[in-house]
């Protein structure tokens, strides 16, 4: 049977300069697309309720946008009746404040099914012209059913959100955050007493992970951890942001007594998040793993052994300025807050600004682009500061970086180098694939969630066809460049042989607006992956020992562990235990890549 690949693009049709937005709607929910008046999930064409806030006459920008999209995709013009009914029905539903309605009220999120390279090129071109934001892609192998369907279904687009402003409103912390959804609220402060069982008898032990936390809460929480666990935890700064904030990090490790004049070369693993400001789940996940390691020392045999072998540097957000901005102004902001050549388009993409294989030519003339890489390598201040810190650790502090994990969202992928080109192969490709598969298995055993493992260059590429016999892609469509990434720089320039970028939950149902209920489950599954990585770097045989549960929340739902967590690397159904065999890794050789 011939198999094709279904490619879905998530993008925001924004009515102003670049807004980022995307959440797929749940199955069975119908939405009336503003340009057509048609329901995307119904068999007929009823006019259904549209939850977009109060109806506003379309602006000139909106009319221009719609006409271009209609010309590209052949969408029929909507009639007056459908527009009137849509407006009337959209008045009542949204509970989002006026500030969010004003910013996001006209935005819609669509999923397009791409079948040809020409359609892909047309959509990418239209997205660039209209400053639309592509959230991501996903591909599924399906039978060649499209040829049996009428053209209207073959070219249909599926709305993925009915009320973006409401979805953003619901994503903010419940307890009086300093956000545009609570314009009168003051900045929250972290209160240690608020997290005790006595004051919150019906909550889990650590209330910190029951919601997304702003920087004003995150920093005091980090200081509190250091004061409580000073024997193996220190608070450091790995740089300064464009707006003058420190980039805080927690260094966790147990240093044995050494009488030598020079300390032994210390192996270090870096876990970072928050490079893209809107990806809140990455900030919470780094914090969760840090808390689990800090509180697990002396209680968990796995954690105790790892902290005796490695220093872990946890950087919850490498983009504090952007993170603060997502709480105060724009929930879907992606870049940092650095000034550019256009005063009304600030910000540089921190994961496109690193020095290795930097390629900003595609966005050099457009600072408004969400992927703007700056005028040159390391123009983004935060990327330059972290790179300088890492180099100094190697040259002055006798540090050897053994691993690097950069957390992002979303799509549930474990990506290894290289991102800039699939033609450039890493020297230890087999080892990267082997450990990547082990991380995915650790996640699957802890939560039953599936994470795909692939090269970073294929994380944003979709294929339209497969070669017979080899199942290799015949044609690939790159949605955006991933040159200049932290992943590639740490691997190549800093020689961190085990570098990964992990894209966290989910696969598109919520996108960047992942509900707070996913914070603890996501943290737990990535905690298990980080533990597995540490054990692999120590010795493959250590993977056979226990992996204890983290100490940062309630127990996992599937209860698939014994008391010591021995089952981490056992396949379901009693299959033999998975064993890693790390092969010899030769010296770094650019010619072999």
UniProtKB/Swiss-Prot annotation:
Which residues are assigned to the propeptide feature?
23-175
The molecular function terms of the Gene Ontology recorded here are:
zinc ion binding
Give the record's cofactor note, including how many are bound: Binds 1 zinc ion per subunit.
Domain of life here? Eukaryota
What InterPro entries does this protein's entry cite? Peptidase_M14
Keyword Protein transport on this protein?
A: no
Which residues take part in binding Zn(2+)? 276, 279, 408
Keywords annotated in UniProt:
Cell wall biogenesis/degradation, Disulfide bond, Glycoprotein, Metal-binding, Secreted, Signal, Vacuole, Zinc
PANTHER family, per this entry? INACTIVE METALLOCARBOXYPEPTIDASE ECM14, PROTEASE FAMILY M14 CARBOXYPEPTIDASE A,B
Annotated region Disordered: where?
75-98, 172-202, 548-593
Q: Report disulfide bridges, numbered on this chain.
A: 345-368
Swiss-Prot/TrEMBL GO biological process terms:
cell wall organization; proteolysis
- This chain belongs to the protein called Inactive metallocarboxypeptidase ECM14
- Composition-biased stretches, type Basic and acidic residues, lie in 78-88
Annotated glycosylation sites: 361
- Which species is this record about? Arthroderma otae (strain ATCC MYA-4605 / CBS 113480) (Microsporum canis)
Could you give one GO CC term from the UniProt record?
extracellular region
Q: Where is the composition biased (Polar residues)?
A: 188-199
Family label: Belongs to the peptidase M14 family.
Where on this chain does substrate bind? 276-279, 334, 351-352, 409-410
Which SUPFAM superfamilies does the entry mention?
Zn-dependent exopeptidases
Q: What does this protein do?
A: Inactive carboxypeptidase that may play a role in cell wall organization and biogenesis.
Q: Where does the UniProt annotation place the signal sequence?
A: 1-22
Location of the Peptidase M14 domain:
211-537
